[in-house]
């Protein structure tokens, strides 16, 4: 038999690879001679390694660059993009309609003019007067959870969907009749229609909260709640046009606040209970991230927007993270739920920087084994993310010195009979991180068949932008994981379990704590986020500079996207489930600065969503005080929503300020927070001066 690796055995640290050009696949076979059998077969001779290949990677989604984040989008665009995603990307059984609904609702929040969001959502969720789309959400959840409703419950839920569809259709028709004055309907009749629809919602929502099937029904519940809340919001926003009396209007404002809290608490507590139960006593990080991603897409993204429905004319630039994680199984390890807070902080510790590249070190070993024959084994030893401004994240895995490499070679030689090995440095750098970021990844572990049977594994850890495909094993698998309107904001990894105790205390914000393992990296992880409004000055400062919308729309800022803080160890990341991302926890007196830019002058008021206690918060814009709050205690004064023990209030600072120019400073000074009584900054909201929250 002919060897495909030529040269001196263990002759040195160099590439020595004569391959026949075939690519790897999961079902491939190994030829037993030098003849090329078929183009889809695995061979022991691999195609030359090129871990920074520039060129086309086949399918490219529609929205892969961050250009023009404020442009108006249409529902048809959302339908095309999410349908395309379902066909081309790993989808965790998620129905594309859930992404369409979220995108449509985000677009609706940006509009100042009155409108009928309920009618738009009704047409999307019940197209052609059918319940099939809502049933698709339920079936997808059953597939992912791997449980099914019993026949009786399924039939009851189907009947409720049919009833809800008919009720919505009747209500929308009645509003149409009133607005078009086709039948001379009086305002009193419209009020009757509104009150009837309100009662129908109140009666039907409990049918999606069946005690033994709460998790299965949660995505359906989230859609039904969104319909109810947008119904109430439409009434408030259109009160003048619909001739709604002031007393009735105040009632529905009270309803909006009441139902946001009631529905949010049910959804958040159901999710948290399911997350903890699913991973008790132990489970893999892969399962944790897949469950969180599924629930974010299907439930938590909507919950995050419910509490923002009281605002109009608002661009929501923040989002919870989505994930893609490798499927490697070697030395994977399982963790208890207590590991999660540590993990959630280390994958976000550089959240205020923009990802610019990935580096790492791998080796590809080839062996001759009496049982497997010749086979290949990949080993990824370490990986590090880099960011604009020359900033590096923590190194994850094992850093090999020359001595350690020589020892490793000898250790491998004792374990088997190596034919040769190849060093594979990974150096991926984005050409334009702001406008052309990584938007997709491909993480696979592929079986490398030996000449006498199953052998080792080869890895594909690939990062994809609009103009590059880079990483380990760029030629060995196809497919990609992406999400419409999301971009990759960080690359991280888990390490292979080797019995050593890891410090799993949560990282303070910005901490560079190396995550080590003598066995190296196990799974690479991509973190996706919806953030797009980066000002070009980010390239100069390194940290994020937030660009204000060009049409005087309000906008949100993630508290994690800060510029500087007086002492980093005073800040931590606090997980929230329904908050468009996590909070910034303050445990001591902190001075936190953010940077804003605007192409033209826009006058805003500042709203801070906070949870916890502090003696004071002072907000200063360009050395100009814009507001303060004293003796904050949201345990007794809050909006009724409980999100991972956070009870929040929106503090509105009424002093207006003009955002104009580049990299202007917004400073938050927090006093009186402690480790035992922290203050969480959950969201930073800038609303146009003349906009008033609905409640």
From Swiss-Prot:
GO terms for molecular function: signaling receptor binding; toxin activity. Pfam families: Endotoxin_C, Endotoxin_mid, Endotoxin_N. One of its GO terms (biological process) is symbiont-mediated killing of host cell. The keyword Transmembrane does not apply. Keywords: Sporulation, Toxin, Virulence. Belongs to the delta endotoxin family. PANTHER family: ENDOTOXIN_N DOMAIN-CONTAINING PROTEIN-RELATED, PESTICIDAL CRYSTAL PROTEIN N-TERMINAL DOMAIN-CONTAINING PROTEIN. This is Parasporal crystal protein Cry18Ca. It comes from Paenibacillus popilliae (Bacillus popilliae).
């Amino acid at each position: 038999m002919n060897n495909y690796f030529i040269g001196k055995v263990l002759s040195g640290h160099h590439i020595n690879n004569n391959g026949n050009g075939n690519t790897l696949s999961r079902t491939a076979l190994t030829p037993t001679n030098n003849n090329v059998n078929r183009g889809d077969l695995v061979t022991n001779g691999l195609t030359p390694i090129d871990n920074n290949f520039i060129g086309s990677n086949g399918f490219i989604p529609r929205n892969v660059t961050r250009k023009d984040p404020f442009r108006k989008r249409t529902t048809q665009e959302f339908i095309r993009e999410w349908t395309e995603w379902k066909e081309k990307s790993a989808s965790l059984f998620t129905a594309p309609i859930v992404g369409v609904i979220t995108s449509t609702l985000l677009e609706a929040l940006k509009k100042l003019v009155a409108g009928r969001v309920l009618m738009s959502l009704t047409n999307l969720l019940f197209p052609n007067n059918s319940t099939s789309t809502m049933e698709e959400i339920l079936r997808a959840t059953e597939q992912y959870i791997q449980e099914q409703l019993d026949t009786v419950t399924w039939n009851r839920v189907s009947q409720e969907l049919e009833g809800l569809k008919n009720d919505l259709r009747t209500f929308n028709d009645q509003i149409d009749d009133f607005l078009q004055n086709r039948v001379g309907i009086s305002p009193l009749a419209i009020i009757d229609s509104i009150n009837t629809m309100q009662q129908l919602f109140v009666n039907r929502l409990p049918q999606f909260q069946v005690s033994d099937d709460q998790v299965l029904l949660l995505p359906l519940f989230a859609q039904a709640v969104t319909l109810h809340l947008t119904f109430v919001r439409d009434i408030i926003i259109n009160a003048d046009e619909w001739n709604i009396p002031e007393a009735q209007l105040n009632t529905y404002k009270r309803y909006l606040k009441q139902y946001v809290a009631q529905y949010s608490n049910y959804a958040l507590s159901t999710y948290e209970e399911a997350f903890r139960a699913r991973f008790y006593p132990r489970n893999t990080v892969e399962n944790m991230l897949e469950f969180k991603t599924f629930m974010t897409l299907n439930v938590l993204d909507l919950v995050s927007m419910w509490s923002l429905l009281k605002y109009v004319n608002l661009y929501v630039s923040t989002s919870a993270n989505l994930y893609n994680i490798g499927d490697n199984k070697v030395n994977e390890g399982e963790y208890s739920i207590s590991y999660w807070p540590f993990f959630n902080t280390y994958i976000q510790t550089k959240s205020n920087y923009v990802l610019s590249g990935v580096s790492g070190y791998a080796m590809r070993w080839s062996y001759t084994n009496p049982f497997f024959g010749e086979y290949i084994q990949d080993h990824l030893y370490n990986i590090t993310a880099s960011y604009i401004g020359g900033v590096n994240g923590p190194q994850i895995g094992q850093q090999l010195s020359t001595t350690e490499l020589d020892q490793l070679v000898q250790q491998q030689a004792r374990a088997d009979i190596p034919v040769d090995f190849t060093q594979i440095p990974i150096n991926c750098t984005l050409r334009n991180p702001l406008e052309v970021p990584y938007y997709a990844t491909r993480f696979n572990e592929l079986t490398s068949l030996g000449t006498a049977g199953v052998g080792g594994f080869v890895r594909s850890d690939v990062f994809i932008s609009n103009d590059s495909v880079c990483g380990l094993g760029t030629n060995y698998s196809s497919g990609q994981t992406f999400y419409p309107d999301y971009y990759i904001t960080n690359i991280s990894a888990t390490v292979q379990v080797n019995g050593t105790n890891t410090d799993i205390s949560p990282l303070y914000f910005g901490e560079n704590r190396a995550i080590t393992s003598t066995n190296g990296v196990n799974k690479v992880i991509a973190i996706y986020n919806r953030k797009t409004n980066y000002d070009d000055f980010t390239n100069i400062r390194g940290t994020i500079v937030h660009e204000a919308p060009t049409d005087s729309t309000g906008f949100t800022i993630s508290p994690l996207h800060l510029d500087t803080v007086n002492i980093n160890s005073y800040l931590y990341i606090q997980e929230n489930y329904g908050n468009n991302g996590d909070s910034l926890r303050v445990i001591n007196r902190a001075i936190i600065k953010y940077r804003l830019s605007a192409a033209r002058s826009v006058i805003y008021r500042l709203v801070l969503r906070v949870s916890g206690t502090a003696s004071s918060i002072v907000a200063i814009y360009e050395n100009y005080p814009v507001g303060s709050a004293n003796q904050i205690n949201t345990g007794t004064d809050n909006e009724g929503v409980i999100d991972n023990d956070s009870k929040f209030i929106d503090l509105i600072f009424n002093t207006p300020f003009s955002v104009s120019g580049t990299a202007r400073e917004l400073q938050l000074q927090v006093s009186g927070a402690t480790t035992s009584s922290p203050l969480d900054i959950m969201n930073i909201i800038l609303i146009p001066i003349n906009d008033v929250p609905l409640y």
